[in-house]
Swiss-Prot record:
The keyword Transmembrane applies. Keywords: Cell inner membrane, Cell membrane, Ion transport, Manganese, Membrane, Transmembrane, Transmembrane helix, Transport. GO terms for cellular component: plasma membrane. It comes from Klebsiella pneumoniae (strain 342). The keyword Transcription does not apply. It comes from the Bacteria. It is a multi-pass membrane protein. Belongs to the MntP (TC 9.B.29) family. InterPro entries: Mntp/YtaF, Put_MntP. GO terms for molecular function: manganese ion transmembrane transporter activity. This is Putative manganese efflux pump MntP. It is found in: Cell inner membrane. Disulfide bonds: none annotated. Probably functions as a manganese efflux pump.
């Protein structure tokens, strides 16, 4: 996977966390930058670890499906992207409608884990491709840190307007990356 695809994947994977952070920021009255950074760090670390776990699980099965790797990555990314789009359109969310005014550590960890399950599944798909999983996981984690921190800070202003659109955009990006993987296999 080239650098631009890695960056697109990283920011595509961060959109769930961004949407969740907007929701979190929307429930806080004038959140401090330190709260935004704390949230970003929690989301970023978890989002870095989950693709590594998924990659490890995928490697266990790689000898059985190497000839199908492009299809596996494509199907996983289209499924995850489609799910994000459907959730964005329907208005479903991992976030509770009446989120607390103060966000405790375990609430943030639980939310971060819930939004990072997609990254774990992507990690499984990446096990079948020739990618640097550490570089990709770090890119996903850094993008998630940035987007989650930003989401908290602007959440109270744009939460009602952009929250679900961020999930839709993330889903479109994932489907695009899956299509690019499949196209690259057949084109070259």
């Amino acid at each position: 996977m080239n650098l631009s695809a890695t960056i697109l994947l990283a920011f595509g994977m961060s959109m769930d966390a961004f949407a969740a952070s907007i929701g979190k920021g929307a429930t806080l009255h004038k959140p401090k930058f330190s709260e935004a950074v704390r949230t970003g760090l929690i989301f970023g670390v978890i989002e870095t670890l989950t693709p590594l776990v998924g990659w490890g699980l995928g490697m266990l099965a790689s000898q059985f499906v190497l000839e199908w790797n492009h299809w596996i990555a494509f199907i996983l990314l289209v499924f995850l992207g489609g799910r994000m789009i459907v959730e964005g359109v329907r208005g479903d969310s991992d976030e509770a409608c009446d989120a607390p005014r103060r966000h405790g550590f375990w609430l943030l960890v639980t939310t971060a884990f819930a939004t990072s399950l997609d990254a774990m599944a992507v990690g499984v798909g990446l096990a079948f491709l020739q990618v640097s999983i550490v570089t990709t996981a770090l890119a996903i984690g850094c993008a998630t840190f940035l987007m989650s921190t930003l989401g908290i800070m602007v959440g109270r202003f744009i939460g009602p307007l952009l929250g679900k659109r961020a999930e839709i955009l993330g889903g479109i990006v994932l489907i695009g990356i899956g299509s690019e993987i499949l196209w690259s296999h057949f084109a070259g």
